């Protein structure tokens, strides 16, 4: 018994030491949790303040962009501008020969509506070029038309095809000439020439006329 007592005392001291170590570990583990629980609300408040500041900065940037953005330009439709444009001018054929609606001469009289828009000399020069093209092409078309009519019964109408093709080529030549005149002068003066079909004044038949349209002027200096 005298031998066992010292050993039991040793075991008691060892168990006490282990219990003390466990208590120290528990206290050390609880201290960070308490500190974290204490520091948690402070961190949340700081995060909320940062988010509010960022949102305020974004709102200020959006307001600045809205203030700096110019107002959208007001679009004026072309139909609205054409509605208030003057009526187009018709230049009808004045020749004594007409082949498939195309006369051999256009009227060279200067329309009074074009006063102040284009010089009379320029108008007569342009009409003179068109008449020169017709004077060169129409006599050949008339000859082929007469031959086609004479042989129409024998060829079942096929003899009229040459004069139809020649008349189509003459129209294309005049259209190219008018387009050249537009690019040279008339588009700069807000005018547009074109060859188109219209009814005759004395009958229901169709004829080719030169239509002079007034191009709309866009109000670029008009305030919004």
Curated annotation (Swiss-Prot):
One Pfam family named in its UniProt record: Erf4
Q: Which residue intervals are annotated with compositional bias (Low complexity) in the record?
A: 26-40
Q: Name one GO cellular component term.
A: cytoplasmic vesicle
Cellular compartment(s) = Cell membrane; Cytoplasmic vesicle
Q: Where do the segments described as Disordered lie? A: 1-80
Spell out the coiled coil positions from the record: 42-70
Which stretches are tagged as biased composition: Acidic residues?
A: 13-25, 41-69
The record's annotation in InterPro entries points to:
CHIC1/2, Golgin_A_7/ERF4
In what way is this protein post-translationally modified?
Palmitoylated.
The tissues in which it is expressed are: Equally expressed in various parts of the brain.
Q: Which UniProt keywords apply?
A: Cell membrane, Coiled coil, Cytoplasmic vesicle, Lipoprotein, Membrane, Palmitate
Q: Does the record bear Protease in its keywords?
A: no
Its main localization is membrane
**Family that this chain belongs to:** Belongs to the CHIC family.
Database matches in PANTHER family: CYSTEINE-RICH HYDROPHOBIC DOMAIN PROTEIN BRAIN X-LINKED PROTEIN, CYSTEINE-RICH HYDROPHOBIC DOMAIN-CONTAINING PROTEIN 1
Instruction: Indicate what this protein is called per its UniProt record.
Output: Cysteine-rich hydrophobic domain-containing protein 1
**Per the UniProt entry, what species is this protein from, by scientific name?**
Homo sapiens (Human)
Chain's gene name = CHIC1
